[in-house]
Design a protein with these regions (language model features):
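Non-catalytic alpha-helical scaffolds and adjoining flexible linkers that form interface surfaces
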Residues: 1-160
Length: 160
């Protein structure tokens, strides 16, 4: 089931990204909240929570995404992209001419709110990019296979 795959993915990320026996209280507390959400809520809610958990995990490992305002203009509205270099949001207007170089920012991670199930695939692609670049790639490690399977399964569920 998809919920079990989500839990397995989170545990694999923790296992493979964090040093053994190093305290990580925020990661632990975040995992407990995620587990409650996976257990108690439907697919749309827990998948959104899972992606937010991955974003929080990236922050705890030293690469915090700045998704609350445009890195170029400072605007907080119409955020549509993420800079692959800085990990910061870019507005629709500021990013239009660089659209092909920017990563899509799923609207459920902005004030726009949830619009379509494909956003879950976009959210997982967003976090995977930064996992590869700043967490696993630094040590020449692949993203954990349970995380890859979760992405593939979500892609199949929400294919247009």
């Amino acid at each position: 089931p998809l919920k079990l795959l989500g839990l397995t993915s989170a545990v694999a990320i923790i296992d493979q990204a964090l040093p053994d026996r190093e305290p990580a209280a925020e990661v632990w507390h975040g995992l407990l909240v995620l587990l409650d959400t996976i257990t108690d809520y439907d697919e749309y809610i827990w998948l959104a929570a899972y992606i937010r958990w991955e974003i929080g995990f990236l922050g705890e490992t030293g690469f915090k995404l700045g998704l609350d305002k445009c890195v170029v203009t400072g605007d907080v509205e119409d955020l549509s992209f993420v800079s692959p270099k800085s990990g910061c949001a870019v507005s629709d207007v500021a990013g239009e001419q660089y659209r092909d170089k920017l990563l899509p920012l799923p609207s459920f991670l902005t004030s726009k709110g949830f619009k379509a199930p494909k956003e879950f695939s976009e959210g997982l692609q967003l976090t995977e990019y930064f996992f590869k670049r700043h967490v696993f790639g630094v040590y020449n490690k692949p993203v954990p296979s349970p995380r890859q399977r979760l992405f593939e399964r979500v892609e199949m569920l929400h294919a247009d």
